[in-house]
């Protein structure tokens, strides 16, 4: 039997105080547990594959700060590098050698990137790349996909995923129609709809931006031929193809989704992993396109803390760790064991589920599946997911508090962690 015995008294007290200080008591909406019920747990510390809350409860973590913690939380080599960097200062507001080092690592790894610009978040990266798409092509319209999330900038809050989907918001108040009027949307994995948009708006579309593997509407991989088709359509129409690899970059392979699937876009956005747990973002691509960016060209973009030495240091050390032999084989093995076990246990308990993984990224829907699109994801049983989430929390497993978020493993997850997670799932899934 499931019992609600988790002691979260201190978390509740802190969250109650936070609600008087911050909108909804959080700094980012999905953290509020709105879609799964109950109140959020407040973290005290993290280490490896585990997190501890302020009440002393320990959890196996499959959120990983929403993706960055691919090597595990508080990796000793990353911490050592950061401590050394701290002695030199936290921010320069000027060029530093560390930018060159991380830039070279990114350029060497990501097939599309010949030149890169560092920023402070994935949202910044996507805002900047949209401006660059328009500046380079001289066109204003952009195609995005339903359920794909590219940050909270006005022009992207159209049929967006992540927190927008989690809270059930149609889009967002405060976004003028004049801003979103040039944002066209298509169902993910639907090439016909993309071709139709190009036919309806000839010579007006600057490009197509997408999560090559969707992680902000749950885990939704591309159908066979989808990415290839987008590459062909954009080339035929003189438009740019942009992969938003803020989530997939350095996670599903060292060179991201574009390396994994063998499709090279014109531009790429990055974040999460390349900051090693510190705030970071980046965008890059073909040299002729990136030459438009100031001060090399006329398209303006800037940032006070961009390229700061701490984020660069953490990113460099994280990528060094990921380059070691067997890294992605380990992620694939551990994640495969996790998701195959969850699916089997759920089905044996009588639940209709579907899901999958690519290396360190995974997802499961309470739906017969397969899930190809945002509409498919929305048809999954959200109420059952909420019960599953709470039950797993009671059993010491921390999952993303939304069915519209992918899960993540790290190099710190062990077979014992996976076994414990699956044992917890047996208890929970037998009782919901």
UniProtKB/Swiss-Prot annotation:
NCBIfam families: hemL, PRK00062.1. It holds the Pfam family Aminotran_3. PANTHER family: GLUTAMATE-1-SEMIALDEHYDE 2,1-AMINOMUTASE, GLUTAMATE-1-SEMIALDEHYDE 2,1-AMINOMUTASE 1, CHLOROPLASTIC-RELATED. Its EC number is 5.4.3.8. It is found in: Cytoplasm. The keyword Ribosomal protein does not apply. Keywords: Chlorophyll biosynthesis, Cytoplasm, Isomerase, Porphyrin biosynthesis, Pyridoxal phosphate. InterPro entries: 4pyrrol_synth_GluAld_NH2Trfase, Aminotrans_3, Aminotrans_3_PPA_site, PyrdxlP-dep_Trfase, PyrdxlP-dep_Trfase_major, PyrdxlP-dep_Trfase_small. It comes from Acaryochloris marina (strain MBIC 11017). Its main location: cytoplasm. Its cofactor is pyridoxal 5'-phosphate. One of its GO terms (cellular component) is cytoplasm. PROSITE patterns: AA_TRANSFER_CLASS_3. Homodimer. The modification N6-(pyridoxal phosphate)lysine is found at residue 272. GO terms for biological process: chlorophyll biosynthetic process; protoporphyrinogen IX biosynthetic process. It catalyses: (S)-4-amino-5-oxopentanoate = 5-aminolevulinate. GO terms for molecular function: glutamate-1-semialdehyde 2,1-aminomutase activity; pyridoxal phosphate binding; transaminase activity. This is Glutamate-1-semialdehyde 2,1-aminomutase. Belongs to the class-III pyridoxal-phosphate-dependent aminotransferase family. HemL subfamily. Pathway: Porphyrin-containing compound metabolism; protoporphyrin-IX biosynthesis; 5-aminolevulinate from L-glutamyl-tRNA(Glu): step 2/2; Porphyrin-containing compound metabolism; chlorophyll biosynthesis.
């Amino acid at each position: 039997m499931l019992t609600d015995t988790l002691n979260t008294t201190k978390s509740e007290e802190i969250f109650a105080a936070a609600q008087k200080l911050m909108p909804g008591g959080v700094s980012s909406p999905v953290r509020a547990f709105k879609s799964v019920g109950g109140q959020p747990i407040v973290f005290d510390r993290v280490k490896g594959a585990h997190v501890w809350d302020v009440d002393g409860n320990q959890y196996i973590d499959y959120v990983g700060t929403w993706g960055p913690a691919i090597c595990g939380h508080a990796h000793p080599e990353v911490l050592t590098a950061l401590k050394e960097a701290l002695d030199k200062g936290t921010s320069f507001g000027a060029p530093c050698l560390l930018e060159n080092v991380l830039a070279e690592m990114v350029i060497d790894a990501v097939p599309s990137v010949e030149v890169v610009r560092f920023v402070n978040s994935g949202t910044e990266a996507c805002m900047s790349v949209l401006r660059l798409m328009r500046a380079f092509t001289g066109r204003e319209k952009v195609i995005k996909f339903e359920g794909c999330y590219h940050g909270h900038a006005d022009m992207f809050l159209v049929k967006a995923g992540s927190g927008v989907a989690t809270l059930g918001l149609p889009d967002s108040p405060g976004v003028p129609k004049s801003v979103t009027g040039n944002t066209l949307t298509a169902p993910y994995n639907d090439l016909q709809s993309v071709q139709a948009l190009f036919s309806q708006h000839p010579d007006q579309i600057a490009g197509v931006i997408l999560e090559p593997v969707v992680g902000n509407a749950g885990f939704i991989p591309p159908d066979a031929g989808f990415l290839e088709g987008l590459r062909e359509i954009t080339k035929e129409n003189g438009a740019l193809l942009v992969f938003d690899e803020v989530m997939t970059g350095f996670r599903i392979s060292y060179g991201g989704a574009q390396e994994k699937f063998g499709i090279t876009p014109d531009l790429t956005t990055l974040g999460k992993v390349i900051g090693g747990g510190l705030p970071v973002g980046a965008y890059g691509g073909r040299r002729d396109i990136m030459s438009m960016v100031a001060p090399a060209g006329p398209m303006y973009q800037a940032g006070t803390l961009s390229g700061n030495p701490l984020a660069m240091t953490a990113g460099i050390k994280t990528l060094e760790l990921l380059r070691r032999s067997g890294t992605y084989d380990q992620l694939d093995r551990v994640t495969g064991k996790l998701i195959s076990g969850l699916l089997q246990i759920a089905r044996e308990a009588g639940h209709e589920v579907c899901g999958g993984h690519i290396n360190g990224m995974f997802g499961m829907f309470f739906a017969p599946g397969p899930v190809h699109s945002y509409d498919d994801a929305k048809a999954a049983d959200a109420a059952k997911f909420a019960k599953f989430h709470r039950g797993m929390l009671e059993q010491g497993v921390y999952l993303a508090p939304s069915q519209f978020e992918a899960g993540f493993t790290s190099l710190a997850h062990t077979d014992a962690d996976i076994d414990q997670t699956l044992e917890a799932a047996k208890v929970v899934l037998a009782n919901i």
